[in-house]
């Protein structure tokens, strides 16, 4: 593996926190709106951002892809959103769950909570829960908004309305603090969603990215493309010493030497920084991420000599 390629991977993983902060800021450019108690409603809201970021956030500069998809599917005029689906597929092919690890504001929020000094618990024994997010994607994002409709043929955005904690964190709380009318209108649904947010906050302090692992439908969608994404993990078998440090460092419970592009891998780069021989790195292009050592080839003359003996 070239030193230049390995060095770039180390640099990217080292500055991941700054990249996450920058992505969160770009996703929420209109910060003065927090004081005004209103929403940005310009042309940017016609474009989806890659991560989970609520449309109702006063500072949001774009639309949440999950919320936008449900709005179209639940509409009485349309039955499917080709634009948003195509947008998500494109991001999935280009980046996969790199978006989760580097560009998602709510993922970064959970990581910051996890830095609070307290006893941490592993999620390795809770791996079956990782399949819940696929059920959330299928049922709450696709099926219910499309088929559970009212008298005029409109469906609710079930994930956003009943489950997503980001909507409360970025939308309901700041808007209600700045707007007395919204504050007076808060009811039982807000109480339910606020309880979910509190649960995610507490779990995030103890577990690493619990919402990302277990419930996020956007992460589930990107995970479907992790194995074919152009942005992948690369393991150089010729320099790997099988020390296991990469697997111990991974907080997403992935052994990169066995499955470099596992569906749960968010390309955070912890394994890259933990590897003592720089055998693990990021790569961009096609392939399975495994670089097998090249077997030495015997000279032709030597082979002919051995055959005649």
Predicted stretch roles:
Residues 1-257, 263-309:
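Non-ligating segments of multi-cofactor redox enzymes
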């Amino acid at each position: 593996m070239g030193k230049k390629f390995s060095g770039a991977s180390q640099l990217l993983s080292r500055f991941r926190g700054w990249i996450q902060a920058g992505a969160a800021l770009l996703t929420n450019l209109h910060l003065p709106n927090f004081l005004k108690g209103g929403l940005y409603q310009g042309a940017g809201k016609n474009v989806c951002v890659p991560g989970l970021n609520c449309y109702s956030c006063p500072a949001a500069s774009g639309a949440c892809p999950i919320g936008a998809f449900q709005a179209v599917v639940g509409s009485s005029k349309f039955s499917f959103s080709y634009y948003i689906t195509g947008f998500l597929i494109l991001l999935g092919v280009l980046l996969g769950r790199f978006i989760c690890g580097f560009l998602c504001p709510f993922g970064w929020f959970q990581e910051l909570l996890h830095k609070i000094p307290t006893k941490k618990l592993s999620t390795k024994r809770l791996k079956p829960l990782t399949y819940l997010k696929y059920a959330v994607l299928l049922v709450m994002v696709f099926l219910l908004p499309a088929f559970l409709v009212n008298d005029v043929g409109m469906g609710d955005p079930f994930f956003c309305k009943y489950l997503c904690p980001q909507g409360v964190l970025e939308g309901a709380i700041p808007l209600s603090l700045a707007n007395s009318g919204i504050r007076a209108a808060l009811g039982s649904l807000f109480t339910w969603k606020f309880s979910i947010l509190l649960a995610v906050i507490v779990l995030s302090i103890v577990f690493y990215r619990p919402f990302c692992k277990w419930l996020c439908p956007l992460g589930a969608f990107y995970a479907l493309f992790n194995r074919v994404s152009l942005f992948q993990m690369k393991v150089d078998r010729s320099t790997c010493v099988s020390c296991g440090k990469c697997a111990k460092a991974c907080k997403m419970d992935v052994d990169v030497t066995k499955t470099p592009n596992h569906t749960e891998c968010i390309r955070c780069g912890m394994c890259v920084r933990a590897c003592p021989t720089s055998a693990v790195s990021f790569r961009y292009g096609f392939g399975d991420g495994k670089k097998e050592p090249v077997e030495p080839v015997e000279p032709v003359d030597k082979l002919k000599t051995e055959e005649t003996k």
